[in-house]
Amino acid sequence: MKANEIRDLTTAEIEQKVKSLKEELFNLRFQLATGQLENTARIREVRKSIARMKTVIRQRELSVNN
């Protein structure tokens, strides 16, 4: 998901997506440890998506405080 798409969502929706992505990341890491993961690049994609979403949330927090 691109940053522009994330900015269109509400903060609550973003937080919900972060939660689901963290669960997916946990499962991907578990699959990696057990040797079942085929697409290892997916871990990187999920981590970057979480970071993008957290960045948008933080930008909103800072813009409200200023």
Curated annotation (Swiss-Prot):
InterPro entries tied to this protein: Ribosomal_protein_uL29, Ribosomal_uL29, Ribosomal_uL29_CS, Ribosomal_uL29_sf
Pfam families: Ribosomal_L29 (PF00831)
Record keyword Methyltransferase present: no
GO biological process: translation
An MF annotation (GO) of this entry: structural constituent of ribosome
Keyword tags: Ribonucleoprotein, Ribosomal protein
Organism superkingdom: Bacteria
Cellular-component GO terms for this entry: cytosolic large ribosomal subunit
Statement: the UniProt record of this protein carries the keyword Membrane: no
HAMAP family the UniProt entry points to: Ribosomal_uL29
Protein family: Belongs to the universal ribosomal protein uL29 family.
PANTHER family for the chain: 60S RIBOSOMAL PROTEIN L35/50S RIBOSOMAL PROTEIN L29 (PTHR10916), LARGE RIBOSOMAL SUBUNIT PROTEIN UL29C (PTHR10916:SF0)
Designated name of the protein: Large ribosomal subunit protein uL29
Species annotation: Oceanobacillus iheyensis (strain DSM 14371 / CIP 107618 / JCM 11309 / KCTC 3954 / HTE831)
Gene for this chain: rpmC
